[in-house]
Each structure stands twice: as structure tokens, then as C-alpha cells.
Amino acid sequence: MKVRASVKRICRNCKIVKREGVVRVLCTDPKHKQRQG
């Protein structure tokens, strides 16, 4: 899980999801998981 100020899709499988006011990126590749913070 990477914590970044700006989350972006890295590949086409990445999905941007907003959970409880936190923007997250979910992907089939675990290295692409990100959270805004």
C-alpha cells in the first residue's frame, strides 16, 4: 500500500474507489494499491 498525496491509475486494471472519504486505488497487481493521505 502506497500512501500518496495524489493517487493515479498506474495500469488499466486499476480502479479508483472512495471509501469513507478516503480515495483508494485497487488493482489486480498488489504493487499498485494506493491510498490518499
From Swiss-Prot:
Coiled coil: none annotated. It holds the Pfam family Ribosomal_L36. Keywords: Ribonucleoprotein, Ribosomal protein. One of its GO terms (molecular function) is structural constituent of ribosome. Disulfide bonds: none annotated. InterPro entries: Ribosomal_bL36, Ribosomal_bL36_sp. One of its GO terms (biological process) is translation. It comes from the Bacteria. One of its GO terms (cellular component) is ribosome. Belongs to the bacterial ribosomal protein bL36 family. This is Large ribosomal subunit protein bL36.
